């Protein structure tokens, strides 16, 4: 009988193995297969945004100045959406709109679709990066799952919402003041603050902030092996074998404060994951609803009574009037291509006037 010793090895020159070895080897900045999507898309998205905010005007799409070159600052510069007449065109540089002319492409708003699409794929690449690294070091993939929340919000707001409307024009432009304008637009045209999905989103984000503050303070409060003298940084010593904080003490403290407390670390940290991610997903679902022009809560009985009785008004009816004002004043400013002119007598006024 013949016994063969040693291991069977594949052909060393296999292209996939060579690429896999190079992409996933241990280095200061991990690349990975996900990096083939992440790094180019992130580079182009950020590069497009810096280019647009520095040099490109929004005069031809919105009738606005939007670049540092025109006098804007960091808060007012933006990469603005294409004109409404371009609908949902991808606005490729070589497409029928720009016909390979880079200057014309920028004037038409081509940088917005460029930044939006590369940004979306860059975020997806970052989530895949977390999956890939988690698999490499044998972790659960909850980081990647949690990051699906911001991705869902980005995709719903910047892509799905304008796809449900008449064009990319109604998406947010990429800038601070531009996002504020979009928020006012959402309130005036969709009554977004009274939408239950927005309420769940606010509860999730603010609830997560509260949980983070409570959790961080509690762990700091219950650290032990805390060093000697004024130096407290030994609490973070990575070579300390045992735990650095007391879960039992934390449980007793919050049991006395609230009457209830987490007794299990896994449930506690899952809850801290669940609250913000669920909130972000609910917000994203709500924005998808707005893309289809679904309405928020309507308390019609209060509106009818307020219209009939000058002395009856609620915070809801006042908000409805404010929304009408936003629509009337904003539409003419925000959609100059419609040539909207509202006479004074049709502009909304509250009962107090």
Swiss-Prot record:
Residues annotated as transmembrane: 41-61, 125-141, 153-166, 208-228, 279-295
- Where do the annotations place Fe cation binding? 215, 269
Its main localization is plastid
Coiled coil stretches, renumbered: none
Q: Which domain of life is it from?
A: Eukaryota
Bound how, and how many: what does the cofactor note say? The D1/D2 heterodimer binds P680, chlorophylls that are the primary electron donor of PSII, and subsequent electron acceptors. It shares a non-heme iron and each subunit binds pheophytin, quinone, additional chlorophylls, carotenoids and lipids. There is also a Cl(-1) ion associated with D1 and D2, which is required for oxygen evolution. The PSII complex binds additional chlorophylls, carotenoids and specific lipids.
Positions annotated to bind a plastoquinone = 215, 262
Q: Where in the cell is it found?
A: Plastid, Chloroplast thylakoid membrane
**GO terms of biological process kind:** photosynthetic electron transport in photosystem II
Q: What Gene Ontology terms describe what this protein does at the molecular function level?
A: chlorophyll binding; electron transporter, transferring electrons within the cyclic electron transport pathway of photosynthesis activity; iron ion binding; oxygen evolving activity
- Where Phosphothreonine occurs along the chain? 2
Q: Name one Pfam family in it.
A: Photo_RC
Membrane topology according to the record: Multi-pass membrane protein
Q: Which residues hold pheophytin a?
A: 130, 143
Q: Which residues bind chlorophyll a PD2?
A: 198
UniProt cross-references to PROSITE patterns, sorted A to Z: REACTION_CENTER (PS00244)
GO CC annotation terms, alphabetical: chloroplast thylakoid membrane; photosystem II
Listed InterPro entries: D1/D2 (IPR055266), Photo_II_D1/D2_sf (IPR036854), Photo_RC_L/M (IPR000484), Photo_RC_L/M_CS (IPR055265), PSII_PsbD/D2 (IPR005868)
Q: Which reaction does it catalyse?
A: 2 a plastoquinone + 4 hnu + 2 H2O = 2 a plastoquinol + O2
The residues listed in the UniProt record as binding chlorophyll a ChlzD2, with positions renumbered to this chain, are 118
- Give the EC number(s) under which this enzyme is classified: 1.10.3.9
The modified positions for N-acetylthreonine read 2
**What the protein does?**
Photosystem II (PSII) is a light-driven water:plastoquinone oxidoreductase that uses light energy to abstract electrons from H(2)O, generating O(2) and a proton gradient subsequently used for ATP formation. It consists of a core antenna complex that captures photons, and an electron transfer chain that converts photonic excitation into a charge separation. The D1/D2 (PsbA/PsbD) reaction center heterodimer binds P680, the primary electron donor of PSII as well as several subsequent electron acceptors. D2 is needed for assembly of a stable PSII complex.
Query: What does the annotation say about its assembly with partners?
Result: PSII is composed of 1 copy each of membrane proteins PsbA, PsbB, PsbC, PsbD, PsbE, PsbF, PsbH, PsbI, PsbJ, PsbK, PsbL, PsbM, PsbT, PsbX, PsbY, PsbZ, Psb30/Ycf12, at least 3 peripheral proteins of the oxygen-evolving complex and a large number of cofactors. It forms dimeric complexes.
Name by which UniProt lists this protein: Photosystem II D2 protein
Gene name, per UniProt, is: psbD
């Amino acid at each position: 009988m013949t016994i063969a010793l040693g291991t069977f090895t594949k052909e060393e020159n296999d292209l996939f193995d060579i690429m896999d070895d190079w992409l996933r080897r241990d280095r200061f900045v991990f690349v990975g297969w996900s990096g083939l999507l992440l790094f180019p898309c992130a580079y182009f998205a950020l590069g497009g945004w810096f280019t647009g905010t520095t040099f490109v005007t929004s005069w031809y799409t919105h009738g606005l100045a939007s670049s540092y070159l025109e006098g804007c600052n960091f808060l007012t510069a933006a990469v603005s959406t294409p004109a409404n007449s371009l609908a949902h065109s991808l606005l490729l540089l070589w497409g029928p709109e720009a016909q390979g002319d880079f200057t014309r492409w920028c004037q038409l708003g081509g940088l917005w679709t460029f930044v939006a699409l590369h940004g979306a794929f860059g975020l997806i690449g970052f989530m895949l990066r977390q999956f890939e690294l988690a698999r490499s070091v044998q972790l659960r993939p909850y980081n990647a799952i949690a990051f699906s929340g911001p991705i869902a919000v980005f995709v719903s707001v910047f892509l799905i919402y304008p796809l449900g409307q008449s064009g990319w024009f109604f998406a947010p432009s990429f800038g601070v003041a531009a996002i504020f304008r979009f928020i006012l637009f959402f309130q005036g045209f969709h009554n977004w603050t009274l939408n239950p999905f927005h309420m769940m989103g606010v509860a999730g984000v603010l609830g997560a902030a509260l949980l983070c503050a409570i959790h961080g303070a509690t762990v700091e409060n219950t650290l032990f092996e805390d060093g000697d003298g004024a130096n407290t940084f030994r609490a973070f010593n990575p070579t300390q074998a045992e735990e650095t904080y007391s879960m039992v003490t934390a449980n007793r403290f919050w049991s006395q404060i609230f009457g209830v407390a987490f007794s299990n670390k896994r449930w506690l940290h899952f809850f801290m994951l669940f609250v913000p991610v669920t909130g972000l997903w609910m917000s994203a679902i709500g924005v998808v609803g707005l893309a289809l022009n679904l309405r928020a809560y309507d308390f019609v009985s209060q509106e009818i009574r307020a219209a009939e009785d000058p002395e009856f008004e609620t915070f809801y009816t006042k908000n409805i009037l404010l929304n009408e004002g936003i629509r009337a004043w904003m539409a003419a400013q925000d959609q100059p291509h419609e040539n909207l002119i509202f006479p004074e007598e049709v502009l909304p006024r509250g009962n107090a006037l």
